[in-house]
Structure formats: structure tokens, C-alpha cells
Amino acid sequence: MVELESQEAVTVASTADIAVDVSLRLLAAATSLAAAVVVAANHQQRWGIRVDFTLFQVWIGFVAVNLVCTVYAAATAAAAARKAMGRWWLHHADAVVVNLEAAATAGAGAIGSIAMWGNEASGWYAVCRLYRRYCNAGAAALALSLAAVLLLGVACARSRYPKMPPTT
């Protein structure tokens, strides 16, 4: 006997499943917001030269993407709390946001790597020996952003095959 897709038993999401989704998304929002705030508030002045995140377009993009991810993760956490998960668009939107966050983190990490170790072939010198506090804050922001990527990635994987929320 052939079972049709419409005849499959529907697995209903438990309260614990919904709590996990909400928690993942709220943690992702918090870590993404923290990364944006750390970078935006990060500056150091030495020998009359002030460095801050506006010196590099990649850091401006990093802050913007992290703020967008914060808003998205908080909004989808609210949707999960209202049991509106399992919509057809959610996994696709999750995948886009995870990839944006990963790209922003990778781009900022590449610039941070050059700042840390330099690149003699292109004439870029390591500046983290001079601006240690600035670089340490940048590294902390990258770690927070990577945590947001991982949390959003797990939420994205969970949204791929969602359990349907219980009907009330």
C-alpha cells in the first residue's frame, strides 16, 4: 500500500521545541547586538592618530549586518513564541541571514588578520602592536559574531524540518 504525503502523521512541536527555537534566536540576537556595539564603541588613540571602525568599510558593513541580524533574530524569536514557525519562507530567510552574518564576519576577520600580522608583499604593516586594545576588542567582536553565526545556523537547520506548532 502506498502512503500519500497528505496521509503522513503530523508531528506537533512541544513547548520545549518552541523554547529551544526562541532561545537560539534570542541568544543570536544578543550576541550579534553585542558584536555591533563592541565594534561601534571601539576606538583608540595613539600618537595623535585615532582609529575606530569608520576607517574601514568592512567594519561599517560588519556593524550594519550585525544590527540587521539582531532585528531579524528578535523578530523571528517573537514569531516562534507566537507559534508562527514552520512557515515556508522561514528557512530561506534564515539561510540568507546566516550567510550575510558569515560573510560580514569573514570580511572583518580578513581585515583583522592583516591588522594583526600584516602583509609584507603588499606593504601593509601589522598595526596591532601599536593599537593592542583596539585589536583585542575587534577580536572579541569577531568571536561574538561567530557565535551568532553558529546560533543562527542551528536555528536555520531546525527551521528546515520544523515540527508544526500545536493548534490551540
UniProtKB/Swiss-Prot annotation:
Localisation per UniProt entry: Cell membrane
Chief localisation class: membrane
Topology of this chain in the membrane: Multi-pass membrane protein
Any one cellular-component term (Gene Ontology): plasma membrane
Spans through the membrane: 18-38, 55-75, 96-116, 137-157
Key words, A-Z: Cell membrane, Membrane, Transmembrane, Transmembrane helix
Subunit structure comment from the entry: Homodimer and heterodimers.
Name of the protein: CASP-like protein UU-1
Lineage of source species: Eukaryota, Viridiplantae, Streptophyta, Embryophyta, Tracheophyta
